[in-house]
């Protein structure tokens, strides 16, 4: 019973305080994440409380954008939220969302704060208030329109989910699982194994989308309930550490396709050297001829690499899960739920199928199919889009790095709603079944402010990705043969 209580407390209040990273900075562009270290997930220390009071006791001042921008370092970091200035220097290391907060040191964090935080977090801001922002010029019209649009969507109830809709998705997933298992129960041939593994891979992909929904707080108003089902679908079904995923995914949402000043990726989703370079600027950081030899063929390698995506993610997740720095409760929860995944997966294979070769074939094929199906959707969403290393506001950063694919009932389901990826990046806590309702308004917003609303067919998106990879591969070939 004590373990259950610990688990619920962990989900509700301390799920994301797994690690805080030390950073190396390049100008104002944010952190390069390097070394993990354990941070206590308990309450504030007396020293922290005193430091917090010292912030509160200061007489509020008036600050310019330049004043705020000068406080952009660990230990000396300010942030703007709704035209007010906050000194978060003593809070940043204990931020429940982890290191993602560092991507907005010295910047206006209004939109990212509103996007990712519950109402209770707004009250906590008062503890760090030091003054008001004095703008030398009016707020960017794009940001003003975006904030007005978000407020309108809230009034219209578009951030409230249909529980019946999510129940239906869960039942569809259960049917996929049952069909996969029934196939190999009925027929033990290799053809049946391929069919069953394909269905199981599709099941894993679709459970990935459900985990994504829950962990973005799209389904329930209660964050603990969302976290519980996130762990169920994430750790238990997919076998991925939820906390590992949250750490990298939060940074992806706040800094999509962003690099530091030296073009080292901050967004781990484009940190794929030495196998893939997603921009010529990233390629320019490569000096090794051996790596250039690989990169000149990257447009041919992308499809085979997608098959291996699950293995890459699994490796990263397991390194995180079995990190000895995890505290006892957290480590037990992560290890136990991930171990449960491998237990049922292995049991299904070896209990149903005879021998060793056939169970292993089924397990490997499932992983390959799941990797392809997940990776294919991710690749179409952001790859081949702009990669940048200068500070951008939240809205522009999301739109210029993101691509939609043409909607249809199958694409909506297959991609887990990520065919409306632009809408998801602008409003990640909105239930995905509402994205089609807001798409025309988002497209109009982009058109009004001269931003490309990239919405192409799946084939068109695939061609765009391969074309971008080939252009970079050609550059790698030129550099290689020029040496």
Swiss-Prot record:
It is found in: Membrane. CDD domains: Delta6-FADS-like. Residues 60-134 form the Cytochrome b5 heme-binding domain. One of its GO terms (molecular function) is delta6-acyl-lipid desaturase activity. PANTHER family: DELTA(5) FATTY ACID DESATURASE FAT-4, FATTY ACID DESATURASE 2. PROSITE patterns: CYTOCHROME_B5_2. It comes from Ceratodon purpureus (Fire moss). A motif (Histidine box-3) lies at residues 421-425. It catalyses: (6Z,9Z,12Z)-octadecatrienoyl-containing glycerolipid + 2 Fe(II)-[cytochrome b5] + O2 + 2 H(+) = a (9Z,12Z)-octadeca-9,12-dien-6-ynoyl-containing glycerolipid + 2 Fe(III)-[cytochrome b5] + 2 H2O; (6Z,9Z,12Z,15Z)-octadecatetraenoyl-containing glycerolipid + 2 Fe(II)-[cytochrome b5] + O2 + 2 H(+) = a (9Z,12Z,15Z)-octadeca-9,12,15-trien-6-ynoyl-containing glycerolipid + 2 Fe(III)-[cytochrome b5] + 2 H2O; (9Z,12Z,15Z)-octadecatrienoyl-containing glycerolipid + 2 Fe(II)-[cytochrome b5] + O2 + 2 H(+) = (6Z,9Z,12Z,15Z)-octadecatetraenoyl-containing glycerolipid + 2 Fe(III)-[cytochrome b5] + 2 H2O; a (9Z,12Z)-octadecadienoyl-containing glycerolipid + 2 Fe(II)-[cytochrome b5] + O2 + 2 H(+) = (6Z,9Z,12Z)-octadecatrienoyl-containing glycerolipid + 2 Fe(III)-[cytochrome b5] + 2 H2O. Keywords: Fatty acid biosynthesis, Fatty acid metabolism, Heme, Iron, Lipid biosynthesis, Lipid metabolism, Membrane, Metal-binding, Oxidoreductase, Transmembrane, Transmembrane helix. Fatty acid acetylenase able to introduce a delta(6)-triple bond into gamma-linolenic and stearidonic acid. Also able to introduce a delta(6)-double bond into delta(9)-unsaturated fatty-acid substrates. Pathway: Lipid metabolism; polyunsaturated fatty acid biosynthesis. GO terms for cellular component: membrane. The histidine box domains may contain the active site and/or be involved in metal ion binding. Belongs to the fatty acid desaturase type 1 family. A motif (Histidine box-2) lies at residues 249-253. Heme binds at residues 95, 117. GO terms for biological process: unsaturated fatty acid biosynthetic process. The keyword Zinc does not apply. Pfam families: Cyt-b5 (PF00173), FA_desaturase (PF00487). This is Bifunctional delta 6-fatty acyl acetylenase/desaturase. It is a multi-pass membrane protein. A motif (Histidine box-1) lies at residues 212-216. The chain crosses the membrane at residues 164-184, 191-211, 225-245, 302-322, 337-357, 360-380.
């Amino acid at each position: 019973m004590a373990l259950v209580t610990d688990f619920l407390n962990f989900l509700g209040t301390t799920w994301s305080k797994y690690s805080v990273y030390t950073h190396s900075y390049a100008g104002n562009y944010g952190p390069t994440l390097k070394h993990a270290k354990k941070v206590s997930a308990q309450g504030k220390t007396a020293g922290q409380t005193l430091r917090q009071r010292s912030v509160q006791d200061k007489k509020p001042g008036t600050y310019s954008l330049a004043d705020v921008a000068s406080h952009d370092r660990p230990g000396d970091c300010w942030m703007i939220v709704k035209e007010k200035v906050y000194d978060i220097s003593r809070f940043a290391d204990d931020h429940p969302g982890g290191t993602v907060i560092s991507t907005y040191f010295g910047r206006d964090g209004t939109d990212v704060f509103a996007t990712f935080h519950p109402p209770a977090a707004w009250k906590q801001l008062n503890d760090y208030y030091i003054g008001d922002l004095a703008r030398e010029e009016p707020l960017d019209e794009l940001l003003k329109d975006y904030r007005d649009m978000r407020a309108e969507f809230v009034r219209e109830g578009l951030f409230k989910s249909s529980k019946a809709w999510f129940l239906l998705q869960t039942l569809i997933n259960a049917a996929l699982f049952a069909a996969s298992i029934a196939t190999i129960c009925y027929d033990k041939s290799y053809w049946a194994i391929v069919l069953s593994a394909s269905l199981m891979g599709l099941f894993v992909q679709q459970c990935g989308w459900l985990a994504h929904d829950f962990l973005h707080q799209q389904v329930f108003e209660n964050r603990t309930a969302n976290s519980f089902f996130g762990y169920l679908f994430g750790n238990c079904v997919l076998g991925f550490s939820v906390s590992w995923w949250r750490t990298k995914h939060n940074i992806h949402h706040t800094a999509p396709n962003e690099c530091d000043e030296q073009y080292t990726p901050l967004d781990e989703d484009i940190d794929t050297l030495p196998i893939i370079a997603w921009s010529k600027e990233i390629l320019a950081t490569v000096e090794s001829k051996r790596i250039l030899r690989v990169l000149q063929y990257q447009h041919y390698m992308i499809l085979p690499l997608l098959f291996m995506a699950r293995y890459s993610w699994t490796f990263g997740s397991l390194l995180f899960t079995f990190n000895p720095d995890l505290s006892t409760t957290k480590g037990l929860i992560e290890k136990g739920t991930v171990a449960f995944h491998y237990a049922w997966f292995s049991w299904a294979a070896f209990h149903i199928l005879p021998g060793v070769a056939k169970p292993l074939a089924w397990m490997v094929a499932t992983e390959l199919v799941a990797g392809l199906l997940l990776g294919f959707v991710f690749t179409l969403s952001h790859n081949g889009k702009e990669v940048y290393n200068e500070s951008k506001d939240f809205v522009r950063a999301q739109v210029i790095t993101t691509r939609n694919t043409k909607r249809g009932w199958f694409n909506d389901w297959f991609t887990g709603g990520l065919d409306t990826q632009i809408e998801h990046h602008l409003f990640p806590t909105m239930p995905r079944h509402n994205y089609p309702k807001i798409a025309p308004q988002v497209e109009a917003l982009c058109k009004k402010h001269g931003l490309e609303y990239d919405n192409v067919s799946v084939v068109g998106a695939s061609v765009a990705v391969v074309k971008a990879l080939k252009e970079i591969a050609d550059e790698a070939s030129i550099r290689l043969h020029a040496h």
